[in-house]
Amino acid sequence: MEVYLDNSATTRAYECVRDIVGKVMCEDYGNPSSMHKKGVDAEAYVREAKETLAKILKVQEKELYFTSGGTESDYLALIGDARANHRAGKHLITSSIEHPAILNTMRYLEEEEGYRVTYLPVDEYGRIRLDALKEALCDETILVSVMYVNNEVGSVQPIAEASAIVKAYNKNILFHVDAVQGFGKYKIYPKKMGIDMLSVSGHKIHGPKGIGFIYINEKAKVKPIIFGGEQQKNMRSGTENVPGIAGIGLAAKTIYTDLDEKVAHMRALKQHFIEGVQKIDHTVIHGLYDETSAPHIISVGFAGIRSEVLLHTLEEKGIYVSSGSACASNHPAISGVLKGIGAGKEYLDATLRFSMSEFTTEEEIDYTLETLYNCVPMLRKYTRH
């Protein structure tokens, strides 16, 4: 049996997405900026995707810009805001457990462009401390960036509450949300929640890789980071990736169809898995695992077994999981997220992330649990202390 439990790293594309991407590449392959029929046909896919995404988020189509993915969207939000608003201040705020796309961009702004960054602490469950956010705000603050769902432990941030604090202090501070793990799992309404910029990636919602988008409130002052042919109102130049755009639009439409049922399915499997894995001695579930946590992510520490060893043992049995953020997994290191939530030292290099999708089955979860029951005691027996 093959069991894919690494859906926070990437997802299997919907069949309908594969079909439309292939159709656009092979039949409707025109440049959407061209004036002839092939170009007009291609532009129709871009327009349809924008209509779909705008309807899901309840925003205006003109506030959406397609990018190469979540990382570029995050970069545009942070760098674009910093360069547009540096005269108003050079202080930025984020959390200590953000995705590397945020943390490394923040460090760049600190080290290369002279910005001051405050990294908010989180509680034991991975939620930002709102009192720390209040204390961090100052007259120099121009941006606050907080992720919707943590990609390692599944903590869900109090986005609306955080935005309210920021806007009460200064309505001109831009509030950015990395929603790469939250979009497709939650109904997100930027206008209602006080979100000025929102980053999304296609391949986390059963869409193509290499495509994402960013919502930027029409009133937000943001400078482009890529220059060229002035596509997308000069905010993101470069010929649009029409196959990817068609794919992400259809993926979003599909995932938000019967979303509540899909989320309930994942939550039930998550609870089933947690109840089963807790039967194994010396294990810990990192973060919350109730209804306030993400429906698809489970972070489990197995004391006495290195993450990499257990990961490859499961791989031999056809089970695919992750030892943390896949975006950093080629460079093994102790997780900053686990450190941030105060995880015990015995779990820092002994934790795996199991992440599900709507396609995950109870049979797959049972097989994974049975495999863990067999291999965890065996590996501990042969681990040197």
Locate each region found by the language model:
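Pyridoxal 5′-phosphate
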Residues: 1-385
